[in-house]
């Protein structure tokens, strides 16, 4: 779901933080960490393609979640106590 003037979609991605993510974890887009195992990602990939590309980099039994978000200030998630710079990243600052 996008309304940011581009072909990218904003996603919320979470994986079990106890899973060993690779040192060079490719998030396939512009991304910002929110917390251990949680990222906001803007990607031109479809949800299915992004989900599988992220899943294949993690151990087989890792719990994961990928959800599209409406990429407009009115649709951004509300949050507190997340990684520094997350709101600035959303705003493009």
Residue ranges and their predicted role:
Residues 1-2, 28:
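Short beta-strand/turn micro-motifs at beta-sheet edges
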Residues 6-8:
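Glycine-rich phosphate/pyrophosphate-binding loop shared by adenosine-nucleotide-utilizing enzymes
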